[in-house]
């Protein structure tokens, strides 16, 4: 029925308003929220402490509907990727990364991505649409309770997922109105109860929305930097033409006034001969000089259309040493899940190709990129 609402679309305020619209008392909203997000209930008949009259109302007017799982892949390193159906021929990926002391879920916010970073295979397919709040939080709901069931864990046992990163398909801050309620649910003690330090939003640098996020839900922030100067970043991250590095760094400083951590994480994809020289690293130090930060260096995950190569390990080590010598905490991301195309930048989705070449500039053409400290430009091959 067209008027059936998905309760996964509601944060605490939305669920309260919905219960009031049904003539119910406010405490019913908290009961519902705990059943949905702490017990994983998907049928109203399971909610035994709700009045029978409320359960009957909900059965005809609402549902609890996460995106349907199309496929479920397990990597040799324990990484798990779900491909989920978000309708209209679109699918997005959700990736779980297990570690000794935590379990991190990488969540998608859009079907496709309009930012079109040059090194990201997700951007190759173009942009279809924003996900709803229910489709975003539904990825966490689906993954948490699927793994709980598999492990035999009950509602009072420790959660499987301890950290969430908005680093899947899409630019979260270009879907702000749906992402913020999903973040609120992740933090809500009547839902997932994660601390702000354990929830990270990754952005390519949508400056106005970074400022809004700082005021509304100041979770940990990661910024996809990937270049040490505007000329290079204009090509690698085209959004830089709208919000260049000086504006982006100023926004990072403002965000730190509200952030749960006292630093910004800068993500930097290591591209052979493009952005990986010692000169680039030194230039980078000048760019971030007044921003408390750490760096996460990401070995590039090659895909055929990119025309790019991964920096070799020695070059990554030299680059990282420049940052470390300057006192900046620097990590090199361990490649995880690349045998199931779940590694960073590989979330292309088994969906129809939405690329509109006329609208996507130079993607697929020879692109000349200035290399700092080199005598010539680096030419990236055709996609």
From Swiss-Prot:
Residues 99-339 form the Radical SAM core domain. Its main location: cytoplasm. Its EC number is 2.1.1.192. Coiled coil: none annotated. Disulfide bonds join 106-344. This is Dual-specificity RNA methyltransferase RlmN. It comes from Ralstonia pickettii (strain 12J). Binds 1 [4Fe-4S] cluster. The cluster is coordinated with 3 cysteines and an exchangeable S-adenosyl-L-methionine. It comes from the Bacteria. The keyword Iron applies. It is found in: Cytoplasm.
